[in-house]
Amino acid sequence: VRTVAHRLADTPFRPSWIRTPGRMQNTFGNEVFLDEIAAVSGADPLEFRIRHLNDKRGVEVLQRLAKLANWQPRGRDSARGAGDVATGRGVSYVKYELVRTYVAVVADVEVNRKTGVVRVTRFYVAHDCGQIINPDGLRNQIEGNVIQTT
């Protein structure tokens, strides 16, 4: 008898509550890569996502997020701040294929240049899951996702 075991590498992203192990890591990798492509091309990362998305609901979620977060187009270097603290914004988008749920977020962050400590100062969420049966349950799900993310 031969036994083969595969173990996940220890990462700061735990797949415990996600339906598919590795989902968060894959989404993170995809979104970082999109940010890098947008930066190299000098494009705004949110506009870049909208321009290359062929899904009407996804585009609408990103457009609603841009309005909600008062998104201002930006280019390659968007970090601001003098001294030890840099401030910036990040955007992320995901469509969960199995249930056709669309989520887009913007995070306002501060990064201490000396210590590397990151602090999320504000978080915006646009969410489209279709018909909502239990509004309180959906609100709890979204708020729980934000808490787990930050």
Q: What kind of region is each of these model predictions?
A:
Residues 1-150:
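Cofactor-binding beta-sheet edge motifs in enzyme active sites
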